[in-house]
Amino acid sequence: VNEQKNLGDASVINNGLLTISTERSWAMTHSISGSGDVTKLGTGILTLNNDSAAYQGTTDIVGGEIAFGSDSAINMASQHINIHNSGVMSGNVTTAGDVNVMPGGTLRVAKTTIGGNLENGGTVQMNSEGGKPGNVLTVNGNYTGNNGLMTFNATLGGDNSPTDKMNVKGDTQGNTRVRVDNIGGVGAQTVNGIELIEVGGNSAGNFALTTGTVEAGAYVYTLAKGKGNDEKNWYLTSKWDGVTPPDTPDPINNPPVVDPEGPSVYRPEAGSYISNIAAANSLFSHRLHDRLGEPQYIDSLHSQGSASSMWMRHVGGHERSRAGDGQLNTQANRYVLQLGGDLAQWSSNAQDRWHLGVMAGYANQHSNTQSNRVGYKSDGRISGYSAGLYATWYQNDANKTGAYVDSWALYNWFDNSVSSDNRSADDYDSRGVTASVEGGYTFEAGTFSGSEETLNTWYVQPQAQITWMGVKDSDHTRKDGTRIETEGDGNVQTRLGVKTYLNSHHQRDDGKQREFQPYIEANWINNSKVYAVKMNGQTVGREGARNLGEVRTGVEAKVNNNLSLWGNVGVQLGDKGYSDTQGMLGVKYSW
């Protein structure tokens, strides 16, 4: 039949076949009974009730959909149901016999009971699109996975989180791919986990998440078997099972097992957010001699007026850090370009010297965070600009000794991105001000002649610097629903150190205004705040960077009265594997 009006009450007997072909939706109210078979063709939806589902033969859904629309379960007497490619069965139904979901076929579950066995080579859709978790599929017989897909909705949180569920009274076997959609869950630590699949018989089937993991807030969930009395069942757990899932998982013969005592698992994206906010506040941070080399080489006041100058510096660096109880290992590479020049120079007493200048810069950083708990990684990117002013005062311009004070302020703006395997990229911006005050005092420690007819003057320079770091990310919500709030803006970084250097002049350079000044310095650096990210309220912070030790060595050279060069390399070391290595090259031209 292909028209509803052509079918009244029917009895399919003597192994007969009733074929219903429709391109439109039918609500079948007539009785269909007997021992024969029914085949559904066409793209339309055929809705059955208890009377029209009373036949006992085989059902073949070749096209379109057979639906059960009642609030109470419809009893389908068919002893075997085959859902073919492009076929769909849906609704609140209790079947008398077996159901076979073939490749391309779909079983949509509400409150569904399979009276016999269930084979899944297509899709068993536990979750209604965008709907609340709570659908239950009960299989009174055995379940066999033929590399089919099973989808669930769950509100990812603790053990008692709402979820769709499958309850198999018999045995499980074969391989099944699993997809879990998070519906409003903010993530939490689990103990035993969120139960998705309960097995009453022999639990030999393998179930694996299609993405290896599913995320909510700062937590990563994996699918694993239970322990003890729950060893047959399958759970979503945010506890580490000691096995790192592969990037593109397949069901495995030895599935992971929930460890209630294991540590929670954090998302690698947390490391990328932390790296980005730390970079936003530190990329353009610098010291007096980073910006100007040895300013007194060629900036000394001339009798005819003040010298004008332009400077530029290039910085490359590599940072290694950890976060999330050591789970997240981040490496970051950065590049910084800054340039500027003096607007004015003057002296208040014919001995000291004042500078006022402007500067601007461009910087970028790319970071990679690898988790030692889950099988995917995260990438962070940040790029942006800065512009601002600096001012410097020297107590004694003539003999290079005495006190100095340097200050600067910058406005910084950045574009940020965090992306990870098989997950949507998250783009956001950051804005804010950084500012610094630095002071030091230079002592002449001695003068001696070198073996190569050089005259060497040894200087020692204690230094102190306070930097306020006020760049803040925009709070926002990721496409997956995770609320992102970074922490650490407003950090006050304190640096205490000492620099010692030799000013060397060779006799052959007499009258050439050429000087050479190697140096080494050591610093202690303290950060008042920890850079961190809050993901749905769960905070993950960078480790080992509150207190740092630093060593730098470099050289400052005066080529002639107009040109000077400087460069250095430095290493910072902290706790828990934190390290930062940097190289810098600067040039200044005066006229």
Regions found by a protein language model. Name each.
Residues 187-203, 326-345, 484-491:
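Short secondary-structure subsegments characteristic of cysteine-rich extracellular domains
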Residues 388, 470, 479-591:
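Outer membrane beta-barrel transmembrane domains
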